[in-house]
């Protein structure tokens, strides 16, 4: 397979948390993580499983969403959407929504948003990547192994887009 093209979609969320307690260190805890949705389509099987003359084009989009569950608790969703095509035909399509519940305490307001939208998805990513690799392998293809994703860059791009939109 050709190296996949990853298209990050910037995270969006409005997040709030209590003011930090003076003298206390910020704390980030994983309360749980879980698979919310998984879909794998192999629409042209068994023909798609035959040896191919050319490597498929693989496009992957990545999206992060978060929401408050309580004063210091957040759900963070990591959405991975992968599609492999050859000559305009879909070879396989996979859609994964993996999430975690996190407790963030004693984070200053200016660090809360980056912690939730950078650090939390960074913790979820290895598990989501493994599920996607297993799904493609179980679909009869080589495992789709994604390179690590720089969630900091995704976050910074979103901030730049928001600033550009605000100035326009």
Predicted feature descriptions by range:
Residues 2-123, 127-168:
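N-terminal intrinsically disordered, cationic/polar leader segments
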